Regions:
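Hydrophobic alpha-helical transmembrane segments
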Residues: 1-152
Length: 152
């Protein structure tokens, strides 16, 4: 069950990121609702959230032969929960850097894509995007396990 939740979470996050850019409106920060630029860590759109739910549901449906409706519900909720947790971490404690040459915030460190050294502006320096993805997948697994137990 944990594996299904983790896979659903990473799929949901990927679909939200890749399809969320198709949204017509600007993303909003998950924590405050503030309008942010596309690509901002912690920014969400209705399109991206719907894509996350669809991605999580697809993984849950693939696993349905192993656990039926109980698995589908638990994994789908775990997947969406993990993806939303990823956004919360991105909006609050993920390391975000500033590139003075490009005048942009970025996740890249120590050098931005232009080759300029970046400076930490918020978050924990060790909590970069890969760590956020790891914690989000663990959250998806734990939520799915919790759902499995509650529905049992």
């Amino acid at each position: 069950m944990g594996l299904a939740g983790a896979l659903a979470a990473v799929t949901a996050d990927t679909w939200a990121t890749e399809l969320g850019v198709l949204a017509s409106g600007r993303p909003r920060l998950i924590t405050t609702g503030e309008s942010v630029e596309a690509g901002t860590s912690g920014g969400i759109t209705l399109t991206g959230t719907a894509a996350a739910a669809a991605g999580a549901s697809l993984i849950a449906l693939v696993g349905s032969s192993l656990g039926g409706q109980r698995l589908v519900i638990s994994a789908a909720i775990g997947g969406l929960g993990g993806a939303l947790f990823d956004s919360v971490l991105g909006a609050t404690i993920q390391a975000i850097y500033y590139c003075p040459a490009c005048d942009r915030q970025t996740e890249r460190h120590p050098l931005h894509s232009c080759g300029t050294e970046t400076v930490l502006v918020r978050g924990w320096p060790w909590l970069e995007n890969d760590a956020v993805n790891f914690f989000a997948s663990v959250a998806g697994a734990l939520i799915a396990i919790g759902g499995w137990r509650l529905l049992g």
